[in-house]
Amino acid sequence: MKTVTLSRLNAFKHAQEPFSCLTAYDASFAQHADAAGIDVLLVGDSLGMVLQGHASTLPVTLDDILYHTRCVARGKQRSLLMVDLPFMSNADTGQLLRDAGALMRAGAELVKIEGAGWMHEGVRELTRRGVPVCAHLGLTPQSVHQFGGYKVQGREQDDAQRIIDDARLLVEAGASVILLECVPAALGRAVRDAVDVPVIGIGAGPEVDGQILVMHDVIGVTHGRPPRFAKNFLAGRDSIQAAFEAYRDAVKTRQFPAEEHCF
């Protein structure tokens, strides 16, 4: 299988071929996901919840992210490696550049930033310096307290238009990828059509360019009630590898997400 690059993700978009993405936090699971043909691996600050047991992603530090990035970078071969900037890494431009540079040195190939249109100057500064950026819009978990919980975003027309406008602004500033979380399926489609870069969705409907899930949801080990957009692909299968392959195939054939996974 070919190595996945940003150019390849763009080719997937233009060919209308959905691509699969999955979180990974260590070398072993990265090897399994890579071998299963998962196109993008994300070292997400979700590790704060699924690995460290926190109630949110806010306590995750840059050192935490760097440790897991190095682990995943050693385990993967062909998948593109995307990595989260932790909470408040974008407090000012200097810190943003330093933290993003540290992630790239650790093995990141795409740096993900949560926020909204106000990030455009930071995105511009990063891309000027050769750091590829994924802009995370919609439900941004680092803003959970501002949102008042993990709630679907963009239900109202004004909010939906703001997200579309933010996506356009951030792509104009240089963002290479947009990630949409927990928005109505119609908004996912609208953002996909509004920008010429790949749009990855998690709870954003079936008509975005790629899908991402947290690995723990895919193999059914999430504590408590799983999110609506998740599916246990290990159920009825005998290995984690088979679960990852089933997820990949379901995304490629547009069988996932189904209507019950959408807002």
From Swiss-Prot:
This is 3-methyl-2-oxobutanoate hydroxymethyltransferase. GO terms for biological process: pantothenate biosynthetic process. Homodecamer; pentamer of dimers. GO terms for cellular component: cytoplasm. Its cofactor is Mg(2+). It catalyses: 3-methyl-2-oxobutanoate + (6R)-5,10-methylene-5,6,7,8-tetrahydrofolate + H2O = 2-dehydropantoate + (6S)-5,6,7,8-tetrahydrofolate. Belongs to the PanB family. GO terms for molecular function: 3-methyl-2-oxobutanoate hydroxymethyltransferase activity; magnesium ion binding. Mg(2+) binds at D45, D84, E114. Its main location: cytoplasm. 3-methyl-2-oxobutanoate binds at D45, S46, D84, K112.
